Amino acid sequence: VGLGSLNRRTEGIVDHPQEIVAQCFSYADAFLQPVQVLEEITSLLEDVKKLNPKRVLEIGTCKGGTLYLWTRVARPDATIVSVDLRSDKACGGYSRLRTPIYRRFARRQQRLHLVRADSHQIDTLEQVKRLFGGSEIDFLFIDGDHSYAGVKRDWEMYSTLVRKGGIIAFHDVASNYGETQVKRCWDEIKDNFPHREYMVHPEGLYGIGVILK
């Protein structure tokens, strides 16, 4: 099944996040399947759909599944920026071979920018600001460096770009394990804001934390 076929199918169901997620999970033997729990990412996608975002920033794209989902529910003229590394080792970044596929995610008049760089570099932050024309963003998805220092730095650097009333979401907030310490950062900041959590397995893996700014 070609990406064009998937695009046409999802174009007809843009008002139905649950169906969009199902299509993405089943596409081409999981080629674009988000590294997510289906129920959790569906709940977040419903939030993003209601937000009707014009400016979206994703830190950590990997297989491209979540990036694809944001393009489906963002405005037809949205600016969407992905920041990720150039490597595809252990899902730390993605191969250059995926780049032309990801570029085809954009709908209608959407502008999709793939920034292949370290999100923690000041030059990357400045590039992201330029791509959004200096405007505040509506939705930020943080799913990059999962170390405590890494996720905290992404939060500190990019959360200030999000407008009041916007949404900031973190992936992997359910539990700390090994080098994955997102929950530690999440627990430190969540009570300072209105927030919600989507966790199918509260003591297990994954989990999504949502800040309502």
What are these regions (language model features)?
Residues 1-34:
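Rossmann-like AdoMet
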Residues 27-35, 39-213:
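S-adenosylmethionine/decaboxylated-SAM
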